[in-house]
Amino acid sequence: MEKLLLIGINTRSMLKSALKLDYEVFSTSYFSTSDTPAIKNQKIILEEKDNESSGVFEDNFDSASILDISRDYIDEVDYIIPISGISPNDFTKKDRKKILGNKNTSNIENKFKFYKKIKDEFKVPETFLIKDVDEAIEISENKSDVKYIVKPLKGSGGYNINLLNDDSYIQLNDGEKFILQEYVEGINLSSSVLGSDNYKKTIMNSRLLTEHDFKKNNSYIYIGNILPLTKESILTEIKDIDKINNEMIETSQNLAYTFDLIGSNGVDYILNENGLYVIEINPRIQGTFECIEKSLQINMLDAHIKSCLNENVDIPKAKYYAYKKIIYSPCRNKYSKIDLDNIYDLPHLGTITEKSEPLLTIIDKNSNFDKLYKKVENSAKIVNNEAKKYQQDAI
């Protein structure tokens, strides 16, 4: 039996799909959720303990640590699938040969290289590579009619993105590179693309959700997705949803050919009155993974592997709407059991989650969009209320 390693921030959803396939499965992850399947070959960095804090993800996560504890697994397995938090470029050239997926993503993960490669062919926000905040301010002052955001040269999930304005104070860390990008206000959308050597095809469009969608603040942290993309799930009054879907399908496939994307990948967009802007490519299995599985009723990991091995994959039509919503803790709280049938990525009982850290994920499906939306939003209210019941004093 061939051996498969899943490696990344959280492997729970992929593990469940992998265990249905004919592989000996290995897993290395940062998070240890209580609903993560326990397997023989498994390593987890974050040890959640009763009455102890799980800390702050941004302060504690380091991709190098996951790679370090995975060395023996990497040597032993036949295949590797990097998930979020790990780049193919983090591996040695020898180990990259084992990766099922894109093996070199430098022109994608480097947002300025990505911009330069596609700016003449695709609609993109104007982007600059900056040395410091002073340079960013100088550029913005020369174009006073344009709003800008500052974001890391590399990174995903919407972290460390700041709107540049007169009231903001932005501190750039020494040694870290940033870009200044034209701020495009609009509707966040996403495509999931499957690629092999012989084909590239868009399998699903979705409404991408950030904290800004719900709180109307300047936080762009990823919260979830709703799919498939329809006039209901886009959550905005839109005239021609079919035209938008077709443009996303075509643009995503063209981008997949431009970068020769292999396996499952995501393309993020912003739509406004000026058109559809390409924001970035996520060159790996993305956050829509479970939603697509629920909507299409397929094993998405199997589809990813088959496309990487150049096998044909039949993609059925969507059977359900699916909605994923990550709940970030409303306060510092001690986790207690919540009686809901649609919550995942659960903390261990008695462990402490810091305020604004990911608490759990709500994922559900229904053929009726309104029923699905109401159920997920109701579950979100229950989770937030339960978290507040077990609020802990700040350190």
Name every feature range the model reports, one short phrase each.
Residues V25-F26, V124-P125, F178, Y323:
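Hydrophobic anchor at the start of a short beta-strand
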Residues K97-D167:
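A conserved helix-loop-beta module that forms one wall/lid of the active-site cleft
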Residues N165, G195-K200, L271-N274, L309, ...:
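Short acidic-glycine loop/turn motifs at beta-strand connectors
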Residues Q253-E290, I327, K334-Y335:
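Conserved metal-phosphate-binding beta-hairpin within the catalytic cores
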Residues L5, D302-I395:
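Peripheral (often C-terminal) accessory segments that flank ATP-dependent C-N-forming ligase machineries
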Residues E185-L189, V193-F259, N282-C308, K317:
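ATP-dependent carboxylate/phosphate-activation module, predominantly the ATP-grasp catalytic core
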Residues I118, S140-L163, E176-S191, I203-R207, ...:
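ATP-grasp fold ATP-binding core
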Residues M1-E109, K113, D134, E377-N378, ...:
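ATP-binding N-terminal substructure of ATP-dependent carboxylate-amine bond-forming enzymes
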